[in-house]
Amino acid sequence: MDAAPAISRPETRSSWLFGCAAIAAAALLVGVTVAFHGPMTFRPLGVRVQMGDAMRPLAIAAVADVALFAFAFRRCAWRRVASVLAVAIVAVSVLAAARRAAPAYPVSDRALIELATINALDGRQLYGPYSRYGWQHPGPMLFYLLAPFYAAAGSRTAGLAAGALAINLAALAAAIWVLIRHAGPALTVTFTALFALYFARVPGLVVSSWNAHATIVASAALVVISAAVAAGQIRLLPLFLAVASFVLQTHVATFPLVAVTAALVVAAIGRRWIGASAEERAGLKAQANRAAWVLAALWLLPLVEELSRPAGNMSAMWQFARQPPRGGTLPQAFDAWASALTGVFHAGLSLPQGRLIVRSMAAWPRVVAVLHLLLLAAVVVWAARHRRHVHAWMAAQSLAGSVAALWAVTRIPDGIHDHEVFWISAVGVVGAASIAAAVVGSVVSERRPLVRSRGPLVAGLSATLLLIGVPLEGLRQITVTGGPSRSKAADDHVMRVTGAIQSEIERQGSRRPMVVIDQRVWDWAAGVILQLRRQGVRVVIDDGLVAMFAGTLAPDGSEDLEISFCGGPCHERLISRPGNIVVLLTDHIAIDARPLHR
């Protein structure tokens, strides 16, 4: 009797690859269906199986995808399939968690962020986030990036957390990809290790959609990508401009970082142009043309807003920037800058909440910050001598960005707040990674056979662990809290005020209610206006505040009900006016109404 033909190892491995991919794809499809359409019932082989939790099939998909990665380690095509599946599994898992998160009732800036995101879904958002100085940040990129996740999450606040996680993961992945491809194992490992420490210190960062938080990881990616472009990777120029546009449009405090990185990139490209051949110049022109189109597309809406009115938002920002410096003293600015730059090693590191910074008496952050700059300068020289061009430019960009940040802090008026300098901590982490990689490189030569063979493996493993750990932590944050911070007492208060106002609007039969806000309670008013907008009620507000409260209407004389939010003596004045109605009176806020008969 003839023996059965032996199955070769390549055929066996291919069977395992196809099997893992099929299981991952099928489980992912089930997870998507359950997440977006509700529970499902299957009858495989006549057995009734009900699936009501999307996380179970997604967990199966994740396990199968990990197995696919393991079997496809040396096969590029299958690694790409596994990577695509991994991105899809993470995205669906995060959205599934956001869709089942408890309803949230944000106030203050977070309510304004959600209002602007709703406005972006309607295609009407032209402004960036609101600034306490009376203008808006330069552009609305943040809101248009958050909008798809918000919609996919069923218009829940947790969808903003999902969008923030996606933005941070994309920025982090871009930075790590650039480092692996162009910078070498040492810089990749130190970068991932320090950012793992950074995220562990401020875990809520990865899911926060507040603009002061949403630009942190992107700022670090900006430094890394700009270094690669300056070192000769011109094809990354469109990516650099996209990240720079996002960072600047979302938080104008990062202007010094964007300006110096762009200046060094332009200088490097100019130097390359001078010695380039005709063929190389043609390539540079092609990349510059692509970059120009990217820049034009990303800045179209801010330009439309600026040119569509006599005094646009950019004009207001320019007038503010031209004012004489009203910042604090140089010692105060230096202390705030030093604490931010060394923040990853600082015991008091926490997510900023808009609090005024109290000057620290500790001397070590100042000493370490100055030493940090000196070491970065030394790393630039060392890396250039060893022809580690990306490393040299990364240290140079970190050094220039840190110095520019100090200048910027000296110009902050009306006291230095934590959210205005927090972005500097990301630049500090990138600089620390540059220094640490130089130390490792000077001790362990990359020419050693063991380092050359195992270094990329260690770098890939560290990157993989970070890119797995960040979404897992983000998923935990969304699952447990629905976002970076929640307060049940605040939620209950917003619900109570919203319910009272909505009842009064219905009782009066109002079709165009107008809201008047006492500055002392604008944060609560923002939360209530958001809840009304969710329920389809768009209120009229003072013309000067329409940009701040996105989606509200400007007065036109047809308003039929005035609703006042009071947090102080204004309530005592209002109750004496004819026709006043006390809608609600609490320890925090007073709501008065008055019919308008025109």
Which residue ranges define each predicted feature?
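Transmembrane-helix motifs of polytopic, lipid-linked glycan transferases
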Residues: 162-184, 190, 221, 378-381
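Membrane-interface helix-loop-helix junctions at transmembrane boundaries of multi-pass membrane enzymes
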Residues: 76-80, 180-187, 233, 272-289, ...
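Membrane-interface alpha helices of multi-pass inner-membrane proteins
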Residues: 223-225, 237-265, 294-297
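Extracytosolic helix-loop segments that constitute the early lumenal/periplasmic catalytic or substrate-binding loops
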Residues: 112-144, 148, 326-328
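Membrane-interface transmembrane helices that cradle and orient dolichyl/undecaprenyl
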Residues: 9-13, 222-239, 247, 272-276
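Transmembrane-lumen/periplasm boundary regions of multi-pass, lipid-linked membrane glycan transferases
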Residues: 116-119, 273, 287-374
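Loop-to-helix entry region of an early transmembrane alpha helix in multi-pass inner-membrane enzymes
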Residues: 140, 144, 152-170, 205-212, ...
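Hydrophobic/aromatic-rich transmembrane helices and adjacent perimembrane loops
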Residues: 48, 52-57, 215-218, 251, ...
